[in-house]
């Protein structure tokens, strides 16, 4: 089996999908992250597709290396990895269809019957009270965890940050038995991240996500070493 063509389609102007077609008539479908979909389209069509055409999509590890090699001229992160991720998903979809197996079986099989989920707020324009009311609405629907996005990404230690006020209001609204997760998308210096983290510990926050920009791994390590709260990161790498 060989890859015969690749399509990149943006649905409703926001949702990018890739379709990998093969010479045996089987198609794999993958989804890309929605940020700057037209940039990703160029990467997929101009860089990644030539690296895949005519090759066996079932050899997913080799095809991943082909794509990574094709994208070496670009910096880590961004559109190159968004494109690679979507195409990798599509090739796994193909593999599952060919073998007539769900992907989880190809990745080692089922290890649990269910996975806990949390509600997530992507809005950063809510007042602390509005965020608290939103969190409560999800708790009333049965969620036992709520993740809020706060601070001002791209502006380190911005004075408009309301993280602590917001988490305080959310904790008051949902009580002590609900997990609160906080994601600031790299908006703090090391020193300020530690200050904020200690306050989040006092508020019983479940985890503190991306206190430092993704490229500052030493700084992230310093924050993690100074705090007891679990530090989450890695989605931007």
Where do the model's predicted regions map?
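Structured beta-strand/loop patches that form or line metal/cofactor-binding pockets in enzymes
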Residues: 1-29, 33
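Conserved, mostly hydrophobic/aromatic
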Residues: 3, 25, 48, 87, ...
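Metal- or metallocofactor-binding catalytic centers and their adjacent structured scaffolds
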Residues: 21-98
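Residue-level marker for buried hydrophobic side chains located in beta-strands
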Residues: 28, 180-182, 231-232
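Glycine-rich, aromatic-flanked loop segments that form ligand/cofactor-binding clefts
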Residues: 88-124
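Metal-dependent enolase-superfamily TIM-barrel catalytic cores that perform enediolate-based chemistry
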Residues: 114-227
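Ligand/cofactor pocket segment of small-molecule handling proteins
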Residues: 226-236
């Amino acid at each position: 089996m060989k890859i015969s063509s690749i399509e990149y389609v943006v649905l409703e102007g926001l949702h990018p999908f890739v379709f990998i077609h093969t010479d045996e008539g089987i198609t794999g479908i993958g989804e890309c992250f929605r940020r700057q979909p037209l940039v990703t389209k160029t990467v997929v069509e101009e860089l990644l597709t030539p690296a895949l055409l005519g090759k066996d999509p079932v050899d997913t590890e080799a095809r991943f290396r082909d794509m990574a090699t094709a994208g070496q001229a670009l910096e880590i992160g961004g559109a190159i990895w968004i494109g690679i991720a979507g195409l990798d998903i599509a090739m796994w979809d193909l593999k599952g269809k060919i073998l007539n197996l769900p992907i989880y079986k190809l990745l080692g099989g089922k290890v649990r019957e269910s996975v806990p989920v949390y509600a997530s707020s992507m809005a950063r324009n809510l007042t602390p009270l509005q965020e608290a009311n939103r969190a409560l609405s999800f708790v009333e629907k049965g969620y036992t965890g709520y993740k809020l996005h706060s601070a001002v990404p791209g502006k380190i230690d911005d004075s408009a940050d309301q993280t602590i006020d917001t988490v305080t209001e959310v904790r008051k609204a949902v009580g002590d038995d609900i997990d609160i997760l906080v994601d600031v998308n790299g908006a703090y210096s090391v020193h300020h991240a530690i200050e904020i983290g200690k306050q989040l510990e006092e508020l019983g926050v479940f985890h503190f996500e991306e206190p430092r920009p993704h490229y500052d791994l030493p700084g992230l390590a310093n924050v993690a070493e100074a705090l007891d709260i679990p530090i989450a990161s890695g989605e931007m790498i």
